Design a protein with these regions (language model features):
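Alpha-helix C-capping/helix-to-loop hinge sites
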Residues: 52-56, 77, 96-97, 116, ...
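Alpha-helical ds-nucleic-acid-binding substructure associated with the helix-hairpin-helix region
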Residues: 75-151
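C-terminal accessory module of base-excision DNA glycosylases/AP lyases that mediates lesion recognition
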Residues: 1-32, 130-226
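N-terminal polyanion-binding entry modules of DNA glycosylases/AP lyases
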Residues: 1-102, 106, 219-226
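Short helix-capping/linker segments at secondary-structure and domain boundaries
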Residues: 56-62, 116-124, 184-185, 224-226
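Non-catalytic, well-ordered alpha-helical scaffold segments
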Residues: 43-47, 68, 103-110, 139, ...
């Protein structure tokens, strides 16, 4: 049976020096109000998607050092410019020594730019879609990113959302271990049924505690690891 969030928080607090110390750790990863997320320019949404995609499998320090070159090469991640890159532009990117020359990831930026452009045409802006999406259907937002975007499945989409300030759980090794301990899932979530169970658990813990998904996710992880 899943325990109440107060018990989970107490476990994490005991490992991290008490409730005040734990709250200070959680405050290091703040979420943003929906109005602030909605005001994010869509080029920054696309840039965050690109950053997370290129970080996967590479040193984050390497990507950070190269990031100004990425911004220049992808024209500031202007969604329209990236969505409709001609073949010669793609070829130039594949030959650009200033960035990571991974063809699949470069093409993923183009595919995600098209998604951002489409969402803006449908609902005003991609950032607005993310901001308005109800936390109670967080897994639905993950599914949108996975199915309409490229390379945004797994924890990549989760990390994009958290980086944008959306309350977000991330299925890290420690967080998954806590979910298994709490009998939410039997293994790392992979199926729709698994993610529905995680969503239900987070909805319940949020209702009990008044805390958002980012704080709950980090608290769970901190009952296991650093």
């Amino acid at each position: 049976m899943t325990r109440p969030f107060d018990a989970i928080f107490a476990d994490a607090a005991a490992r991290k020096g008490g409730p005040a110390a734990l709250d200070a750790l959680l405050a290091e990863t703040p979420s943003r109000p929906p109005s602030e997320i909605a005001a994010t320019p869509d080029d920054r949404v696309l840039a965050e998607m690109a950053r997370r995609i290129f970080n996967a499998g590479f040193s984050s320090k390497v990507i950070a050092a190269k990031w100004p070159a990425f911004e220049s090469a992808f024209e500031g991640f202007d969604p329209h410019a990236c969505a409709f890159m001609p073949d010669e532009k793609l070829e130039a990117l594949l030959a650009d020594p200033g960035i990571v020359r991974n063809g699949a990831k470069i093409k993923a930026v183009q595919a995600n730019a098209r998604m951002v452009v489409d969402l803006a045409a449908e609902q005003g802006s991609a950032a607005g879609v993310i901001a308005r999406w109800p936390d109670a259907d967080y897994v639905g937002l993950l599914e949108l990113l996975k199915t309409r975007g490229s390379h945004l499945g797994g924890d990549s989409g989760m990390r994009v959302l958290r980086a944008l300030g959306k309350p977000a759980f991330i299925t890290t090794k420690d967080m998954v271990a806590a979910l298994i301990r709490e009998s939410v899932v039997a293994k790392a979530p992979s199926s729709k049924r698994d993610f529905a169970a995680v969503q239900d658990a987070f909805n319940g813990w949020s209702a009990q505690s008044g805390r958002d998904f980012t704080a709950i996710s980090r608290t769970l992880a901190l009952t296991v690891g650093a």
